[in-house]
Curated annotation (Swiss-Prot):
Organism, scientific name: Arabidopsis thaliana (Mouse-ear cress)
Region: Disordered, residue numbers: 40-95
Localization, UniProt: Cell membrane
Membrane topology: Lipid-anchor; GPI-anchor
Post-translational modification remark: O-glycosylated on the hydroxyproline residues.
Protein name: Classical arabinogalactan protein 25
Skewed-composition ranges (Low complexity): 50-59, 69-82
Protein's job: Proteoglycan that seems to be implicated in diverse developmental roles such as differentiation, cell-cell recognition, embryogenesis and programmed cell death.
Upper classification of the organism: Eukaryota, Viridiplantae, Streptophyta, Embryophyta, Tracheophyta
Length: 116
C-alpha cells in the first residue's frame, strides 16, 4: 500500500513540476530588461565591438583594497576565540518555508488523515 502511495506522490510532484515549468511565459532577456540596461548588453546578431573606446563606460578610481592591512589600526571584526563576537545589527528574520515544502507537508498530512 505504501509503495503505491509513494508512486502516486511521485507522479503528483512530477505533474506539478512540469505544469509550473511549462506555464511560465518565455520572454527574451532583452524584453525583460529596462531600456537603460538593454543597450549595455550585446544582442545575438551583433558583430564584435570595435576597440575605438566609444562603447566602453569610463572607469573611476577604485576604493582602497580592504584586504591589505597596514597594521596602523586593529581590525574591528577580529575578536579572540574566548570572547563573545562583537555586537552588530540584529540577525535577519527567519525565512518562510518554500511553497514546495508546504505542498509536501500538506500532501503527507492529508494522506495520513485519509489512511485513518
Amino acid at each position: 500500500m505504501a509503495f503505491s502511495f509513494l508512486n502516486k506522490l511521485l507522479i503528483i510532484f512530477i505533474f506539478i513540476f512540469i505544469s509550473l515549468s511549462s506555464s511560465s511565459p518565455t520572454i527574451s532577456l532583452v524584453q525583460q530588461l529596462s531600456p537603460e540596461i538593454a543597450p549595455l548588453l550585446p544582442s545575438p546578431g551583433d558583430a564584435l565591438p570595435s576597440d575605438d573606446g566609444s562603447g566602453t563606460i569610463p572607469s573611476s578610481p577604485s576604493p582602497p583594497d580592504p584586504d591589505t592591512n597596514d597594521g596602523s589600526y586593529p581590525d574591528p571584526l577580529a575578536f579572540s576565540p574566548f570572547a563573545s563576537p562583537p555586537v552588530s545589527s540584529p540577525s535577519p528574520p527567519p525565512s518562510l518555508p518554500s511553497a514546495g515544502v508546504l505542498l509536501i507537508s500538506l500532501i503527507i498530512s492529508s494522506a495520513s488523515f485519509l489512511a485513518l
